[in-house]
Structures are given as C-alpha cells and as structure tokens.
Design a protein with these regions (language model features):
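Active-site/ligand-binding-proximal alpha/beta "capping" segment
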Residues: 129-166
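Short acidic/polar active-site loop segments enriched in Thr and Asp
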Residues: 65-66, 166, 185
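Metabolite-binding pocket within alpha/beta catalytic cores that recognizes anionic/polar moieties
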Residues: 1-115
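Zn-dependent metallopeptidase/amidohydrolase metal-coordination segment
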Residues: 170-189
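Internal active-site segments that recognize and position negatively charged phosphoryl groups
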Residues: 113-134, 157
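Non-catalytic positions within long, well-ordered alpha-helices that form the structural scaffold/packing
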Residues: 60-63, 161, 180
C-alpha cells in the first residue's frame, strides 16, 4: 500500500488526538482498491471545520463508492458493554455545526440534501452479513453526536436515552453528512 501523511496533503490538518495517526493509505484488498484514513479531527480540537468535506471529497475524487467509518463511542444501553460492535442506523446531532454550512460546490452535491437513509440500507445489509459470516455479534442503534471534549453528565445520559440514542460520541457525524452529500454509500460501526 501507499501511505500519504496528512501533513503532505493540501487541506489536511495535523491531528492532536492520541492514536489518530493522520495518514491516507491506498492499497488493494481482495481485488478492490481501498482508501483508508487513519485518524480524524474532532470539532472540540478547534481545527478548521472544513476537514470532513476534504476527506470525503478526496474519497469521491479518487473513485470511492463506499464510505465505511469506525469510531470509539460510549454505550447508553447497559446490555451493550465495552468492546461491543454497534452498527449505526441513524443519528442525532448535537455537534452544533453542520459541515455543509458555507459555499456549496455542486460538483459534490446539491445545496440542500435529504438525510433519510444516510446510513445506506444495502451497505448496512452487507455489514450485517459480514458480521454473521465472522460469527460476530453486531448490535444496531442510533448514534448521538456531541461536541465534547467533556463527557456527559448522568442527567444528559438519561435525556439522550429518552431521545432514542443507543451510543454516543464526539466524531463521525460531520464526515457522514459530507459523505452522504457526495453520494457515497455510508456505513458506520
């Protein structure tokens, strides 16, 4: 595979969160060209908020059709413990900043985009089938996105559960919105 440090790519920031390497890796996997981002920014880092557009548009321009994302998130269900895999079926955003705010580039998508089926049904079916073939338990749930960096209070956790969320985190939603805007088939675990 070819590895491109974010620092060598125009529009890609240096990352400050431990464990986020900051690399674009392109290689072959079972006959398919695969592009992988190692690392992401978070809104709480106060980094340029255009980064979710940059990564998803880069993926679109190099020919990607699918956008699969992973994250470390917290469970709001006692039945889903640490280390569990949860496939996201929808989200609630409390990030307080939509990454599509600002000038729109029609090359990547329309000014206004519907958010139904953001988590592409056929992609979710493939993820479920893959988990089953590997004998992995794959939970499903709604992701609640918060700004961070502080964790939630007990009262907030109760409120988020009441709103229908199963997992919570400080990332993912901005790039999901941008990937959907670009027409990529989104799946998140």
């Amino acid at each position: 595979p070819e590895v491109f440090p974010f620092s060598d790519l125009a529009g890609f920031p240096e990352l400050s969160v431990a464990g986020h390497g900051g690399e674009l890796i392109i290689g072959q996997l079972h006959g398919f060209t695969v592009a992988c981002m190692r690392g992401r920014t978070h809104y709480y880092e106060n980094i340029e908020h255009g980064f979710p557009k940059t990564i998803t548009r880069t993926m679109k321009l190099i020919g990607c059709q699918y956008f699969l994302s992973t994250n470390a998130s917290g469970s709001l269900r006692e039945s889903v413990g640490p280390g569990s895999l949860v496939m996201i079926t929808d989200h609630i955003s409390f990030n307080f900043n939509n990454p599509l705010v600002g000038p729109n580039d029609e090359e990547f998508g329309p000014r206004f985009i519907g958010m139904e089926n953001v988590y592409h049904p056929a992609t979710r079916d493939r993820l479920k089938a893959s988990a089953k073939s590997l004998d992995l338990t794959l939970h499903e749930g709604v992701y609640f996105g918060v700004l961070g960096p502080s964790f939630e209070t007990p009262a907030e956790i109760r409120a988020y559960r009441t709103l229908g969320a199963e997992v919570i985190g400080m990332s993912t939603i901005p790039e999901v919105i941008c990937a959907h805007h670009c027409g990529l088939h989104v799946g998140v675990i």
